[in-house]
Swiss-Prot record:
Organism this protein belongs to: Neisseria polysaccharea
Subunit (UniProt): Monomer.
Claim: Ribosomal protein is one of the keywords in the record: no
Domain writeup: Consists of three domains, a large central CORE domain and two small peripheral domains, NMPbind and LID, which undergo movements during catalysis. The LID domain closes over the site of phosphoryl transfer upon ATP binding. Assembling and dissambling the active center during each catalytic cycle provides an effective means to prevent ATP hydrolysis.
Family annotation (HAMAP family): Adenylate_kinase_Adk (MF_00235)
Protein's recorded name: Adenylate kinase
Binding of ATP, residues: 105, 114-115
Region spans: LID: 104-141
Amino acid sequence: FITAAFGIPQISTGDMLRAAIKAGTLLGLEAKKIIDEGGLVRDDIIIGMVKERIAQDDCKNGFLFDGFPRTLAQAEAMVEAGVDLDAVVEIDVPDSVIVDRMSGRRVHLASGRTYHVTYNPPKVEGKDDVTGEDLIQRDDDKEETVKKRLAVYHEQTEVLVDFYSKLEGEHAPK
């Protein structure tokens, strides 16, 4: 909705990383190992990818970050680069709900269609509605991986709420 209303692109580091993984790039292979273990890809890699992306023409009128920044270093790098944010939104969801939602997700790899075992189940359990092919659970959606990612979130990302609430001057979200 926001991207359509303002004619701006959504910038998702997750999507950028998944594209690199699918393409089998060196970054993609390195990122896959880290993501599958529930960790965060190194800040320097993410910051570089984001700076490259926001320099593209379609970002000249703005952009919507999705899942970025995730660490204090990433947020500070954006401030140092003069990237001003109009608003920052935190969606506060209990860990138990996140685990349930993510671990219940199933994907048809060829098409990208996404289902959920409880909230959006396929017509036939474990099968894509269109092709009848198998659905898979991505490694990063497995319960133990989701719990590790949440621990990383609480350790590294939660501090951003405080960072942005204290940011002042021209770089402060309005």
